[in-house]
Amino acid sequence: MTSSTSQITGSIVALVTPMLDDGSVDYPALRKLIDWHIAEGTDCIGVVGTTGESPTVNVQEHCEIIRVAVEQAAGRVPIMAGCGANCTAEAIELTQFAKKVGADCQLQVVPYYNKPTQEGQYRHFKAIAEAVDLPMVLYNVPGRAVADMAHDTVLRLAQVPGIVGIKEATGQIDRAQWLIREAPKGFAIYSGDDPTAVALMLCGGHGNVSVTANIAPRLMHELCVAAMAGDTKRAMEIQFKLLPLHKNLFIEANPIPVKWAVARLKLCGGTLRLPMTPLTPANEAALESALHASGLL
């Protein structure tokens, strides 16, 4: 379903959630990160998703992160609020809060662990869209959710009022191409996979929900601008520069490496909550090398 929010394009950072040494959310650091991203050209800020450690923040923290992000952005860039849950009622409650505080859109992941059927997925997302009038971006990430959203299910959901796009995080470009070919006009197709995002955008995709943008926001913005304009030469110049980061930011489970990287660049603290554990020394060395190779150190 088309919506003005489907016009969100470009670099959408999947923002980390800064935490203090005791594991509490560092809200002042979150505000500073948002200001920095806006200054660096990030086009949209996504909060409390996978990279934002949504599985390990409680409901009160989840809501407060959304509220603070909206308040700090102050309309300068859109806020994409992670509101996903594997309980439909909980997802509706989170989405109601996001709408109340002024988020621009919601990101809704395929329900994880309980493995709904395609019909279950359809009814889940449709129920949320009908309950809360806040533009929804679907999020397909079978590597984490286990359940996979089939192509035909996406097309069914694209007809539901309020569902405006999808974050396609399988890394399978052929799947994205079919969606770009067959989805209704105005339905946005975003990459959720940094290594293949440039290819998706060159095929007609609308942007990249990016982990790499946490530490290289200006370069990711420039890559998205070039790719969406069809400037393959410039897009690939930037892509080749960022490749070491795309690889090594996933050397362990996200967000472990990117939390280390933001701390290394002194953007915010790198504390993680269990069951996430710190990056191993061997992988620290690999990511340090990638930061140098990409010109960030």
Swiss-Prot record:
Subcellular location: Cytoplasm
Pfam families, A to Z: DHDPS (PF00701)
PROSITE patterns cross-referenced by the UniProt entry: DHDPS_2 (PS00666)
Gene Ontology MF annotations: 4-hydroxy-tetrahydrodipicolinate synthase activity
A single cellular component GO annotation: cytosol
Reaction equations catalysed: L-aspartate 4-semialdehyde + pyruvate = (2S,4S)-4-hydroxy-2,3,4,5-tetrahydrodipicolinate + H2O + H(+)
Record bears the keyword Phosphoprotein: no
Subunit structure: Homotetramer; dimer of dimers.
Cited function: Catalyzes the condensation of (S)-aspartate-beta-semialdehyde [(S)-ASA] and pyruvate to 4-hydroxy-tetrahydrodipicolinate (HTPA).
Name of the featured protein: 4-hydroxy-tetrahydrodipicolinate synthase
Lineage: Bacteria, Pseudomonadati, Pseudomonadota, Betaproteobacteria, Burkholderiales
Gene giving rise to this polypeptide: dapA
